[in-house]
């Protein structure tokens, strides 16, 4: 799973539309291709979700204001966990329950997709197994280490299975073997991006 996240800087002092006199965004007139998701239907849902939840990231509630740059107006990157709908649902449920506050990816995935690594402060919209937006999270820390150096604390933070390091290694080895880019093979010293995050919406 690649986290190609579009950062959105929170500004508690950002004026609302009434104060600024700016025209509010109308989702019906916005180009879905500007939203960082793969299909127009999901793009429309993501826009609506972002409009309703961006206040939880410290931003004004209105989703987009005419006149801003594209980088300031598009929602954060929207993505789902795992490589199949059932896994996406299970891991999303763990986030919504407060059990999952971390995720990990192979560094090679970012190289293969020519995608930037996540950084602290970036926002993401989490999709369920049917590509509907369900949660807004903010990355709090990112560390690149090797598979065999991931520790018990991080394994527990991933909130999967019995939350032990042993089960983390078994599950993620199987996942990486299924999903590594062509030409890459699993090894205990392969580089892994370990990302921690906080749930902004819905609030626990």
Where are these regions (language model features)?
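Mixed-charge, low-complexity intrinsically disordered regions
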Residues: 2-136, 145-204
